[in-house]
Amino acid sequence: QVPVLAVSGWNDCWPNTVLRLLDNVNAPCRGVSGVWGHVYPNLGGPGPGIDFLGLALAWWDRWLRGDDNGVMDAPALLAYLQDSHNPTPAPSARPGKWVAVNTWPSPEISAKTLHLGPNGLDEAPSVEDFDVEVFSPVWTGLTSGEYMPVAGICELPDDQGPDDALSACFDAAVLDHPLELLGTPLLHLSVTCDREEGLVAARLCDISPDGSSTLMSYGILNLRLRDGRDRVSEVHPGKAMEVTVRLNDLGWRILPGHHLRLALSTQMWPMAWPLAQEATVSIDLAASRLELPVLGPKISGTPTPDLGTPQAADPLPHRVVRQGSGSRKQVHDPLSQEHLLEVKADAGEIEFETTGLRYSSTSSQRYRIVEGDPLSACVEYRADFTFAREDWQVRTESLLVVTCDATQFRLDGRITAYEGTDLVCERTWEERIPRVAY
């Protein structure tokens, strides 16, 4: 019965938490879903940010001190609707508006059904039987951005065009009026698979008049987990399965002149680790449909409370010794057919003026996979941290490598600690995890 103030962002790795808590918590609960990633809401990244400090203090004053300050008079959910915009991986401000939802679930949100057909997405079901076979290269998904963006360099999804070209795409009609969405998109599919395991990745994209493709939401379903993540269900090659792909919750307003695209693939690397075998998934279009949570005009036109401007305490006095930097690049080796995604981040170096303590850090991520070989998938994470003062220095260096074979995942880790040039501690790990469902 603990009161809950649930706060997250559509670009976070947990965009569904707020609505699930509102659905299931019996204690006093309020939710705020902004547009930011895995950062505090006052920091934005992307913005707009809000006065999260004031919001949290008011909540604690009510439930820890007993102040009758009216926080429970606020709407059940405050959510940011992103407007259609060109794709950019940078954490810049996103256009849009806040909406207030007084109760959740809300009777003002209705399901709009679009049926899959040979000509795209349509409000009327297809009258002809038509199957589409989907088989995607193992490197499909490289434009999807980071799983947990923290307002770093180019972490958000880029133009989805390259991945759309590797997917089965279903486009809806161009809109002549805005379409406002808030909630959980659901994709109902009738599928068969030619292997004993398979994966379906679904992406919703906002297609602009110039053809650029902006990722709105995505969902991934391992067909062996179609009946729940707590059980493994067999996949019988050629046998039809009725499955539901739950896409991430979203708040989005598709503007006139734009249109919706559903892109389906059998890979989403590196967001999802590839299964041991490549598989072809066949979709019965006449038995498949997409349900969208459409916001009613009553909510859309309701004034929202002022969420304020970001507030925070002043940082400790410091000087910048070295500016931060970073890079993100994709490389395809045509000889080895390896695809490499490499992300580097240098947080720079700062010195705290009152103590003279200097701090710096660097990190890197390398995602490698070879065309046609799902067992070649390899991820390397490195992170180094250094503290120094005058002629004294300590640092840690860490490395994690994730690989696999047909029966297990391999996690090999190492961390070393130094004082000056002297190694003072070293530990290594070798974990082997059976591939039960993946």
Sequence positions of predicted segments:
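Short beta-strand/loop motif that positions the catalytic acidic residue
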Residues: 6-8
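Short, proline-enriched alpha-helix->beta-strand connector loops that line the catalytic pocket
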Residues: 2-4, 27-28, 109
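C-terminal, loop-rich substrate-recognition/catalytic regions characterized by aromatic stacking residues
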Residues: 46-418, 422-438
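Catalytic histidine-centered segment of alpha/beta-hydrolase-like enzymes
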Residues: 37-49
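Conserved alpha/beta-hydrolase "acid-adjacent" motif
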Residues: 12-18
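Active-site phosphate/pyrophosphate- and oxyanion-stabilizing loops and adjacent acidic/basic residues
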Residues: 19-20, 58
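Catalytic histidine neighborhood in serine/cysteine hydrolases
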Residues: 26-40
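Acidic beta-to-alpha connecting loop that harbors the catalytic carboxylate
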Residues: 10-11, 36-37, 267
